[in-house]
Amino acid sequence: MSLSFELLKAKKVDKQLIVLDDPISSFDSIYKNKIAYAIIKFLSDKYSLILTHNTDLIKLLEHQLNNSFTLYYMNNTEGENNGFLKINDNEKRILLYIPSLIKLFSSEIAHEILNEKAFLISIAPFLRGYCYLIQNNEKKDALTKIMHGYETASTNLSSLYNELFQTDIIKNEHIISASDILAYHIDNLDIIKKDKFPLLAKTLIHSFTYLYLRMTVEKKLVDKYRIDTTNNCMLNQIINKAFPNSKKDLENTKNRIFFLSKKTLLNEFNHFEMDMNIFQPAIDITNKALENEKDEILKKLGSL
């Protein structure tokens, strides 16, 4: 209600540009659609600059009034490409519409891939979420086996990808195991071309890095502390088992807090079962922040 009054006040002022800062972040989903409607209704005669990290609002605005906005990615990090970076129509389409993203992965992406193996690994978490969505448990389980650092199984990612998307764009056979992912050199990844899909290119590099870090932490902790993964298969369980809660062991507490607090080790950065938005993690963290967190995690693992 209070936001509606603020929008009504904004409608009455003589200024043509209205700035809204993350208008739906603190609201339940039941109100989000109403807020999007109110923004369009009250501010239809003005220009609006809406700042948000929530793609739900972007989708709601698009569905209520098609092609009503230009989308930008805002960045302000030393050493990076900064300012308001326009998201082109190609990426706007696949960000807003899951069917367009699936269509891209089944055909158009073929001309953009620079490294097939890296592409397949980077998209593995999304593939698993897609399998969960369409209830293909066999392929979901096969992907799960290569997404945990302590596992030894391997799977043919080429055939799995082609079968899932009913395509033949992956030409070479890539049989991948967890050890293959852990052995990958992740500095200076180049997965797809950046001219047509720059945000997707960034996203896939991030996705690969998140997966690599999670798996590396799992592998190190399971091996070093001889953890039985039968009942401790998830990363948070492994961390708690490696560093059990003890008032007498402050080092354990520090290590546990360190790993549990790292953003890139959260499930949300690797799991798409509840949200098929492949872009959200990459929108939430800058390249520099990811690089710093990667260095911190690997340094901590090396000190154990």
PLM ranges: what are they?
Residues 14-15, 44-46, 66-70:
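Short glycine-/polar-rich loops that comprise or flank the Walker A/P-loop
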Residues 53-56, 77:
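Acidic/histidine-rich catalytic neighborhood
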Residues 1-19, 33-42:
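GG-anchored amphipathic helix commonly corresponding to the ABC/SMC/Rad50 NBD signature/C-loop
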Residues 58-68:
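Short regulatory helix/loop adjacent to the ATP-binding pocket of P-loop NTPases
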Residues 47-53:
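Structural recognition of the conserved hydrophobic beta-strand(s) that form the central parallel beta-sheet
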Residues 64, 75-304:
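Acidic, Mg2+-coordinating catalytic modules of nucleic-acid enzymes
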Residues 26-29, 33:
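Conserved D-loop-proximal element of ABC-family nucleotide-binding domains
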